[in-house]
């Protein structure tokens, strides 16, 4: 059986936090023996579009991925923008997962402040990057088990 090959799509709006999320995801995938590619997008709203582009590329003889890991950070500010980015990025990932039967680990974090963010991105703490990667691996296995 071949190793799963995943695409990590990371939003780099908060570089230091993105580094920590990516570190956790890479560690989890390497520990599981999976292979991966990493692409970067400007923010969380662009992550679902990048996954859709990867699907289109696979349809045109590009790289085919067994699953996807979405990594990003949305920190509440003073405007309604937080709600839009949080809700729409999650909705778009769910739409892709359901309509395309895609294994996606959602590591787009929505937090109130930097303290909450750091507690979630560090591998030594909540390791949400690793959690998202392991979720994607679990969904890949479920898809195989169900005949997908």
From Swiss-Prot:
Keywords: Riboflavin biosynthesis, Transferase. Its EC number is 2.5.1.78. GO terms for molecular function: 6,7-dimethyl-8-ribityllumazine synthase activity. 5-amino-6-(D-ribitylamino)uracil binds at residues 13, 44-46, 73-75, 106. It catalyses: (2S)-2-hydroxy-3-oxobutyl phosphate + 5-amino-6-(D-ribitylamino)uracil = 6,7-dimethyl-8-(1-D-ribityl)lumazine + phosphate + 2 H2O + H(+). The active site is at 81 (proton donor). (2S)-2-hydroxy-3-oxobutyl phosphate binds at residues 78-79, 120. The keyword Transferase applies. Coiled coil: none annotated. Pathway: Cofactor biosynthesis; riboflavin biosynthesis; riboflavin from 2-hydroxy-3-oxobutyl phosphate and 5-amino-6-(D-ribitylamino)uracil: step 1/2. It is an enzyme of class 2 (transferase). Catalyzes the formation of 6,7-dimethyl-8-ribityllumazine by condensation of 5-amino-6-(D-ribitylamino)uracil with 3,4-dihydroxy-2-butanone 4-phosphate. This is the penultimate step in the biosynthesis of riboflavin. This is 6,7-dimethyl-8-ribityllumazine synthase. It comes from Agrobacterium fabrum (strain C58 / ATCC 33970). The lineage of its organism: Bacteria, Pseudomonadati, Pseudomonadota, Alphaproteobacteria, Hyphomicrobiales.
């Amino acid at each position: 059986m071949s190793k799963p090959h995943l695409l990590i799509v990371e939003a780099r709006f908060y570089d230091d936090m993105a580094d920590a999320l990516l570190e956790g995801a890479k560690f989890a995938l390497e520990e599981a023996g999976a292979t991966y590619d990493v692409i970067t997008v400007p923010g969380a709203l662009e992550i679902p579009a990048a996954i859709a582009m990867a699907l289109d590329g696979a349809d045109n003889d590009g790289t085919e991925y067994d699953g996807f890991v979405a990594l990003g950070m949305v920190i509440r500010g003073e405007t309604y923008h937080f709600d839009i980015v949080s809700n729409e990025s999650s909705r778009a990932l769910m739409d892709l997962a359901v309509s395309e039967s895609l294994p996606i680990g959602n590591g787009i974090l929505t937090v109130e402040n930097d303290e909450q963010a750091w507690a979630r991105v560090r591998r030594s703490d909540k390791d949400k990057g690793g959690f998202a990667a392991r979720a994607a691996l679990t969904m890949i296995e479920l898809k195989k088990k169900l005949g997908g």
